[in-house]
Design a protein with these regions (language model features):
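N-terminal capping/small domains of soluble enzymes
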Residues: 1-114, 119-124, 409
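Charged C-terminal helix
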Residues: 289, 302-335
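Short secondary-structure boundary segments
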Residues: 45-47, 145, 214, 287-288
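Alpha/beta enzyme core
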Residues: 32-37, 41, 109-110, 121-261, ...
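Ferredoxin-like iron-sulfur electron-transfer modules
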Residues: 332-353, 364-382, 396-410
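C-terminal helical cap(s) of enzyme catalytic domains, especially alpha/beta-barrels
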Residues: 51-70, 219-237, 288-313, 407-410
Length: 410
């Protein structure tokens, strides 16, 4: 059995799976369930001082879509689209003082942790909520910057989400970090083309880690009704988005080597492992728990353990950042990849019943012959598209250098 424990922002977690700030963590009872099912930590649903955002939660709406863009109707696909609109916890922030104390005591007894997720509309509010959470014995904060920026913080910044502007991100983060003694994690938003710059601003201002990322804002359409699902724009995420999220995890890890919590795109253990190899130390799961239940947590955790054992890895550190470290960084490195060409295994090829490889080749390297598919290695650029689409594993990719050596020998 592999060691799944991980050191993250000063906390020792028994495993890297954290329940994200969402409905599964919106009450004492739900948080207890997450802990009972093995979560390394649970992030509370956002505690905030903006009444309108609490009201929004009371009017939450969801549309869970499949690859056709229609409602899943109980059949949860591997790559669902989670389209929803919600807000903060429904209770006033002061009510959560007792909830936080109770859940932290319960978590500690089970070897888990509570992370308090907060947001505010003022500097004083951010600092006050941060202190409130710390005073309850909570060991870590996650700050949710996906809300309008208050006018008092920076002239001309009204209406700007905090995590879209590096200077504003640094300003607010510094205020929060200075107010407490516990580590602060900043949750980034994908609604920015400056995510790496925003991450640096947060880290330079004292953040212990970053969470990559919160959800996009999308617009989903029900074409049969000629109207948007759930009335209009809403948050959109799900497993389909993991490759975009992992792009930023990789980039931030490569640039700064900081502690990263991967979020938005995790369905199962495979996804979690991809995030770890991209550079995340821990992962946040949320939408899948809302569709599969918190009973899904042990499946993810056990799946990670099984993968490590099967591949001979002793612990998470052995795979942390592996893919990121092996990634090509520059166009020059990408152009230096060894040229390949395709070769067809006649014993496996089903031509003329199947001709998909020829139809998919746009470089005139595959042609129809009288009784077989004919390859033209000299024009093959080694893109591997034919290798991907062949349903019979009849195509293999070989180095052009080996072919040149063979021809020379002949």
């Amino acid at each position: 059995m592999a060691d799944l424990s991980v050191e993250f922002s000063g906390l020792r977690l028994k495993n890297p799976i954290i329940v994200a700030s969402a409905e599964p963590s919106n009450s004492v009872e739900n948080i207890r369930k997450c802990i009972d099912h093995g979560a390394g930590a649970v992030i509370t649903k956002t505690i905030g001082d903006i009444p309108g955002m609490r009201k929004l939660t009371e009017n939450s709406k969801y549309a869970i879509l499949n690859d056709k863009g229609t409602l899943i109707r109980g059949k949860v696909p591997r790559s669902f689209v989670f389209y929803s609109r919600s807000g903060y916890v429904t209770e006033p922030e002061q009510d959560w003082i007792s909830y936080l104390k109770e859940t932290q005591a319960y978590a500690a007894a089970k070897g888990s942790h509570i992370i308090g997720n907060i947001t505010s509309g003022t500097v004083a509010g951010w600092r006050g909520l941060a202190r409130m959470v710390e005073d309850c014995g909570i060991p870590m904060l996650e700050v949710n910057y996906q809300c309008p920026h208050p006018a008092e913080l920076a002239a001309g910044a009204e209406g700007v989400w905090l995590a879209q502007d590096p200077k504003v991100t640094a300003e607010v983060t510094r205020q929060i970090v200075d107010a407490v003694g516990i580590p602060v994690m900043v949750k980034l938003t994908p609604e920015s083309n400056r995510i790496t710059e925003i991450a640096k601003a947060a880290l330079d201002a004292g953040a212990a880690s970053v969470a990559v990322n919160s959800r996009f804002v999308g617009f989903a359409v029900d074409i049969d009704k000629a109207e948007p699902y759930i009335g209009g724009p809403a948050g959109v995420g799900g497993p389909w988005v993991k490759y975009i999220t992992q792009r930023w995890v990789n980039e931030i890890f490569d640039r700064f080597g900081c502690d990263i919590s991967g979020s938005n795109g995790i369905f199962d253990a495979r996804d979690a492992i991809e995030f770890i190899m991209s550079g995340a130390k821990v992962m946040q799961v949320g939408s899948v728990l809302m569709l599969k239940g918190v009973e899904w947590l042990p499946k993810v955790i056990e799946g990670i353990d099984r993968f490590l054992d099967e591949h001979g890895y002793p612990d998470l550190a052995a795979i942390h950042g592996l893919a990121s470290k092996r990634a090509l960084k520059t166009p020059a490195e990408m152009l230096s990849m060894e040229p390949l060409y395709c070769e067809i295994d006649r014993s496996k090829c089903k031509y003329p019943t199947c001709d998909i490889c020829v139809r998919m080749c746009f470089y005139d390297s595959l042609h129809f012959g009288e009784d077989r598919v004919v390859t033209t290695p000299d024009t093959c650029i080694g893109c591997e598209l034919c290798y991907n689409v062949c349903p019979f594993d009849a195509i293999r990719m070989l180095p052009k250098s080996e072919r040149a050596e063979t021809l020379a020998a002949e």
